[in-house]
Amino acid sequence: MNILAKTLAAIAAGTLLATSASAQSAASLVVPIEDEPAPRLFVEPPLPGPLARGVAFIPYRVENLRIMPVGGPAARNVSPRVGHLHITVDDLPWQWADYGQSNTIILVNLPRGEHKVLIEVVDPEGGVLTAQTVTFKSPGK
């Protein structure tokens, strides 16, 4: 009978440990990084070869932020920091959000002339963290 009691006690203890381990949420497994450095954006001029054909390949790099398709107030508390890009061309009244990690912005069918591209690194709710503008002249198609 003593062996049976020990076996049942071991099974009960194992069940309690397994239950508490599986009840731990994913959020509690993430340790936030205190005092994260500010995001940094590096933008290069468009590649000259494609630009001669009216296509702008604008290389960029973001540090201290992961570009991801997430949004909303809860995502502001994710660590390491997440966000996305807002791209505005020639001061037009609209922009688009870029959630990819291609590190290149591609603009096609650019008309001849001067162009300006504003690239903003934003938090999950669209608040601007840093930005750069690249200007260039397109020979057009």
Locate each region found by the language model.
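Short beta-strand edge segments in extracellular beta-sheet folds
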Residues: 135-141
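Short acidic/polar inter-strand loop motif in beta-rich domains
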Residues: 95, 123-131
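Short, compositionally biased P/S/T/A/G/V-rich stretches that sit at domain boundaries
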Residues: 25-56
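Short beta-strand segments within Ig-like beta-sandwich modules, predominantly Fibronectin type-III
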Residues: 94-101
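Surface-exposed, short loops/turns at beta-strand junctions within beta-sandwich domains
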Residues: 107-113
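Short beta-strand elements bearing conserved aromatic residues within extracellular beta-rich modules
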Residues: 85-87
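Short amphipathic, basic-aromatic surface patches that mediate peripheral association
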Residues: 61-77
